Amino acid sequence: VIALVRTDQPGAALSDDWNGFGQRTTGTGTTVFTDAVVKTEDVILAEHRFGYQTAYYQQVLLATLAGIARSAANEISGALRGRARGYSHGAAATPANDPQLLAVVGEADAVAFAAAAVVTRASQALDAAADAALARWDGGALEVDYSTSPQDEEAELATARGQVVLSRLVPESATRIFDALGASGTDTGKGLDRHWRNARTVSSHNPWVYKARVLGDAAVNGAIAPKVWSVGTAVPQKTA
């Protein structure tokens, strides 16, 4: 079953104790429930959840990665534009006219464009899944069967594809931008390292390696992608 638990009650204690080096507000802190009150209507069977739920959650992370990519590209563009210091063995008198440095900025811009395109395509798949779910809905509450549909499957695969690609492209791009600035780009006052830290943190919340396996299994064996999964510490099985 799945339970919706209100956190504005004495039985719920939320702790902002996550100390990751990057993106904040990712909901990674500790939550402890002690005799928390749950209303009957807030308890549903797992099969009654909407089938594209995990894809929807992943889309939030993909959109965040796309935003990081665009922010990094925009910031490096402005930084190179205003850079006066250059190298004697560079390809131009000023950094802003150096074709090699311009190529670095161009790659960052291309990654940001690709990330936005991935998010848009995944959004279309999610829209189709939501439309299909609404078409199946009979107006009831707990009795509705949100069993997996072809649209749910496509939404799951679309976000998985995006995750596999962006989890590598965006952190790599956030590292490459420093090649356009030299050592001055590492000045703590600029804070350019935050783009990599944020991208790396977001990408780590749901490891892409598992989604790559799911995509391969679907492509080769026609396997259905898992829609319900969890993370936590495995409980050792008792032996006789």
Locate predicted features.
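Short beta-alpha junctions and helix-cap segments that line functional grooves
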Residues: 15-19
